From Swiss-Prot:
This is Phosphoinositide phospholipase C 7. One of its GO terms (cellular component) is plasma membrane. Transmembrane segments: none annotated. It catalyses: a 1,2-diacyl-sn-glycero-3-phospho-(1D-myo-inositol-4,5-bisphosphate) + H2O = 1D-myo-inositol 1,4,5-trisphosphate + a 1,2-diacyl-sn-glycerol + H(+). Expressed in leaves, roots, flowers and siliques. It comes from the Eukaryota. It is an enzyme of class 3 (hydrolase). It comes from Arabidopsis thaliana (Mouse-ear cress). SUPFAM superfamilies: C2 domain (Calcium/lipid-binding domain, CaLB), EF-hand, PLC-like phosphodiesterases. Residues 433-566 form the C2 domain. One of its GO terms (molecular function) is phosphatidylinositol-4,5-bisphosphate phospholipase C activity. CDD domains: C2_PLC_like.
């Protein structure tokens, strides 16, 4: 037991004792129930794994492995209380049911949510940051499977740059981005990478792109049979280790001054280090859209406009080699949203809508959007006024079946944490099989419908530890140990979305909250468990202490060790919570 000294005023000091982790009362009770004379034998541990941890297929060999890993060489016949507590709080006691790919990967691409980036080359904001291949590499190393490149003629108009057009962003050469994709596409996942090209090139430069892409990607490149359109998308399993090109025609850009964009986007950035709470994680409010739309269905983010007028032009003027690259065709038919959502039985395609366009369309056409996404791909992207690279609530798009919910991966905050949480599922491969409710053709899911509760998730937050080892002792408070509290809740369909909070425990590096929360879920297939730890500060904003977001459908029941992550989504070295997860 060590002591810490904190300054008080100018000439006084206070000392606090730092205690060690001890098993919570409920853990001690469980140990007593599954032990004999202070020893949990392998047979009794196996009973515990089946009864409490709900590991129905657990074996005696697995129980013995736990004993071996948690005990000293002199006590391999079972677990004492300290060793039992050590096993429960070990990072190997994961809250996720599987850390490997375990879903069916043989369905068409349209049956999966796909980890998707927006303006993947930007290092910061949308207006003046540098363009580089480094954010692309970083995204691929995090499992992102869709990379977006805006391609423009360079200043001499004889080469191709990647940059955010009509802004002050500095360019990066296309060839650097393509080489980065080739080198890192399959660092963490063998499943396909889609490169979406926002094309602003002449036919001559398009021919150069075709040559570059073909030379650099080589046999990795997947192209459909010459002259044919895909009638159905191939599966992720079929496309393993392949790269696909998805593109749409050159576009006319609306004129907008930098000052206009700054004025519109100034209040959209996250104001706190962990990001302000996303309003639609609390409630879904459509009144803003209705009041501000003025009957105009256009979106301000012009660099994502799918217009089939341009599509006809590119097919007429583009060199054959360039057209042959396109594995996933993009297009937005004339005639408004009803035409956009028509399903062609002989052809599949990709449609892009901004977050605002999707919200407007979903007011009247929610079921049609879901039906469209059963065969076709829907990409949703941030509205153009998000110049700080902030993000939006992805659940609205996912609940309508949108596969490519495009995010600014540099836009830290709660929205990105939810995105990262979703794609921790299925082994982190970047593809999550959509739930059956979004794929039924005979009973199309209505995201706006009020549904009965399917199950209730009960979460017990026992305690946390690790901050003492990861942070200086005055990191959270100069005058005393930290005052931690935990926020726990659900991101999901509107009926399921909620956030709750534990009490604040003062002056404690190892807080033991021991509080229980229950979350009724109407659509557990689309729910994510959110946990955040903060340190209460009376005079300033609360300090960030860690966060995690996990897909509910992949949770393991029982008592689990939950490692927390920092604002970037990187796992903390030591910080973790002890929780119990139950479906009741």
């Amino acid at each position: 037991m060590s002591k810490q000294t904190y300054k008080v005023c100018f000439c006084f000091r206070r000392r606090y004792r730092h205690t060690v982790s001890v098993a919570p009362a409920e853990i001690k009770t469980l140990f007593d129930n599954y032990s004999d004379k202070g020893l949990m034998t392998t047979d009794l541990l196996l009973r515990f794994l089946i009864d409490v941890q709900k590991q129905d297929k657990a074996t005696k060999e697995e129980a013995q492995d736990i004993v071996n890993a948690s005990s000293s060489l002199l006590h391999r016949n079972g677990l004492h209380l300290d060793a039992f507590f050590k096993y429960l709080f070990a990072v190997t006691n994961s809250p996720l049911s599987s850390l490997e790919v375990h879903q069916d990967m043989d369905a068409p691409l349209s049956h999966y949510f796909i980890y998707t980036g927006h303006n993947s080359y930007l290092t910061g904001n949308q207006l003046s940051s540098d363009c580089s291949e480094l954010p692309i590499i970083e995204a691929l190393k995090k499992g992102v499977r869709v990379i977006e490149l805006d391609i423009w003629p360079n200043s001499d108009e004889d080469g191709i740059d990647v940059l955010h057009g009509r802004t002050l962003t500095s360019p990066v050469e296309l060839i650097k981005c393509l080489r980065a994709i080739r080198e890192h596409a399959f660092d963490v996942s063998d499943y396909p990478v889609v490169v979406t090209l926002e094309d602003h090139l002449t036919p001559k430069l398009q021919a150069k792109v075709a040559e570059m892409v073909t030379d650099i990607f080589g046999e990795m490149l997947f192209t459909p049979p010459s002259g044919e359109c895909l009638k159905e998308f191939p599966s992720p399993a079929f496309l393993k280790k392949r790269i696909m090109i998805s593109t749409k025609p050159p576009k006319e850009y609306k004129a907008a001054t930098d000052d206009d964009l700054v004025k519109k986007g100034r209040d959209l950035g996250d104001k706190e280090v962990w990001g302000r709470e996303v309003p639609s994680f609390i409630r879904r409010d459509r009144s803003v859209d209705k009041n501000d739309s003025n009957g105009d269905d256009d979106d301000d983010d012009d660099d994502d406009d799918d217009d089939d007028d341009g599509d006809d032009k590119i097919k007429k003027n583009a060199p054959p080699e360039y057209k042959h690259l396109i594995a996933i065709e993009a297009g937005k038919p004339k005639g408004g949203i009803t035409e956009c959502l028509k399903v062609d039985p002989d052809k599949v395609r990709r449609l892009s809508l901004s977050e605002e366009q999707l919200e407007k369309a979903s007011e009247k056409y929610a079921k049609q959007i879901v039906r469209f996404t059963q065969r076709n791909l829907l990409r949703v992207y941030p509205k153009g006024t998000r110049i700080t690279s902030s993000n939006y609530n992805p659940l609205i798009a996912w609940s309508h079946g949108a596969q490519m919910v495009a995010f600014n991966m540099q836009g830290l905050g709660r929205s990105l944490w939810v995105m990262q949480g979703m794609f921790r599922g299925n082994g982190g491969c970047g593809y999550i099989k959509k739930p059956d409710l979004l794929l039924k053709s005979n009973a199309v899911f209505d995201p706006e419908a009020t549904l009965p509760v399917k199950t209730t998730l009960r979460v017990t937050i026992y305690m946390g530890e690790g901050w003492y080892y990861d942070f200086p002792h005055t990191h959270f408070d100069r005058y005393s140990p930290p005052d931690f509290y935990t926020r726990v809740g659900i991101a999901g369909v509107p009926a399921d979305t909620v956030m709750k909070k534990t009490k604040t425990l003062e002056d404690n590096w190892i807080p033991a909250w021991d509080e229980v929360f229950e979350f009724p879920l109407t659509v557990p297939e689309l729910a994510l468990l959110r946990i955040e730890v903060h340190e209460y500060d009376m005079s300033e904003k609360d300090d960030f202490g860690g966060q995690i977001c996990l897909p509910v459908w992949e949770l393991r029941q029982g008592i689990r060790a939950v490692p927390l992550r920092n604002q970037d989504g990187v796992k903390c070295r030591s910080v973790k919570l002890l929780v119990r997860l139950e479906f009741v």
